[in-house]
C-alpha cells in the first residue's frame, strides 16, 4: 500500500522567504478559550500571534517532493493514542529534546530513533539553525502511543506553529534553565491557551549550564508564575529539569542505555513518566458524525489522490462515502484507503492524524481548507453572526478602531478566507458603527467563498500578519 501517512505532518507546504516576518500558511485549528456557552463543540482557534508590524514580505510556497514508501504493515491499536508536542523559545532545545525522546523510547519498540537533523528536516531550516516547519514523530511508553509534533519557536514562524499546536492534547514546554522564560516562551503559552491545548508539562533544559541550584529553583518559580498568569495550574504542573543535549549524546554513544544507567537519560524517562501521568487521555468525539479538515493533498501515481489531516470527530473506514465540503461545490467520494504513520488502519477515529485515499478525485478538485465529512452533516456557508473579542494593542491587536465594511481574513480550521463585516452590535444588543480594540461585539460576517462552518465553531481574525480578534459562530445566516 503506497504510503498516505499523515506522519507527512512534516508538511509538504514549505515556507521560505528572504526576510519574511509574515508566513502566509493558513492555520490548522482547534478550540480557543473564549468560553461563551457550554453547548459549543469548538473547532477553530483564536490565534494570538504577536508578530512584528513590519511590511509583509513576499513569502513563496515551495512544495517538497514526496517520497511515497510502501506501508510497513498494519497499525496495531494496542495502546491509547495521545497527540503531544514541544513548544517554547527558539534555541531552548525543543528539537534536541524530541530527538532524545525518540532515542530513549526506541527500546520500547515501535519508535524509530530519530536524529536531530532528521527532525529538523529541510535544508532551509538547518541553514538558519531554526525550525520553520512542524515535524511529527511517533513513539511509545509502556502505557501509551504518542504522536509528537516539534513546533517551531522562532517568532517569524509562529504562524506555522499553529499547524502543530492545534493538534495537541498536551504540550511539553521547553524552557532553558540558563536563560529562563523568554518572549516566545510567553507567546507559546498564550498561544497554547488560545488554541485549546488543555495540559502542559515543563522541561527545564540546559541544567548542566546552571551552576547554582538556587538559580534553577528561581527559574522554576518564574515559569510556574508565568503559567498561572495564563490560567494554567502553575502550582500543579510537573517541572522536570535535565539536559536534552547530554541525554542525546549519551544515547548516540550507546543506544541501549536503560533506566538508572545515566542521570541525563533518566531525566528523559522521568519527563515521559510525568507526561504519562499528568496529561490525561483525551475524550475523543468518536460518537459524532465524521469530519476531517484537509491540511494537505498529494497524488500517488496509479493509486489516486490522498487528503491528510486530523480527524476532528467521528470515525471513518475504507468503503465509507464522504462529502468534500467548502470553497467549491460539494461532491461525494468513497474512501478507498486509510493510513496512519505509513501503516494501514481498519478505522480512523477522532484525534488520529491520517491520510485518506479518495476514489475518482483529481488533485485539482480538492485543496487545503476543505473538509471531508459524513454526507449531509455539514454544509458550506458564506454568512454568519458571531460573537467576537477584538484584541487590545497590548495583546498584539489593532491600535485603532474598525468600522462596518472592514475586510480582514477569517481563519477557520485549516483555511483562511476574506470576509466583510456587514453589521456590528454591542454585547448589550445596541447597534454600533465602530469597534474599539478590547471590545466584545456581535458581528455579521459575509465571506467571499463558501466555507464548511457551523454554530459553535471558533475562528481567528487576522490582518497584516497579526491576529486582531477571536470569535465563535453564534448563528448561521446563509
Curated annotation (Swiss-Prot):
Domain tr-type G: 79-283
Region (G1): 88-95
Keywords from the named record: Chloroplast, Elongation factor, GTP-binding, Nucleotide-binding, Plastid, Protein biosynthesis, Transit peptide
Organelle transit peptide: 1-69
Entry's Gene Ontology BP terms: mitochondrial translational elongation
Renumbered residue ranges of the record's region G3: 150-153
PROSITE patterns linked: G_TR_1 (PS00301), G_TR_2 (PS51722)
Main localization (coarse): plastid
Span list, region G2: 129-133
Listed Low complexity bias regions: 1-29
Region: Disordered, residue numbers: 1-31
Keyword Amino-acid biosynthesis in annotation: no
Residues noted as binding GTP in the record, renumbered to the chain: 88-95, 150-154, 205-208
Residue segments, region G4: 205-208
GO MF annotations, alphabetized: GTP binding; GTPase activity; translation elongation factor activity
Any one of the GO CC terms: chloroplast
Localization annotation: Plastid, Chloroplast
Transmembrane segments: none
Region: G5, residue numbers: 243-245
Homology family: Belongs to the TRAFAC class translation factor GTPase superfamily. Classic translation factor GTPase family. EF-Tu/EF-1A subfamily.
HAMAP family: EF_Tu_B
Its job: This protein promotes the GTP-dependent binding of aminoacyl-tRNA to the A-site of ribosomes during protein biosynthesis.
NCBIfam families per UniProt: EF-Tu (TIGR00485), PRK00049.1 (NF000766), PRK12735.1 (NF009372), PRK12736.1 (NF009373), small_GTP (TIGR00231)
Protein name per its UniProtKB record: Elongation factor Tu, chloroplastic
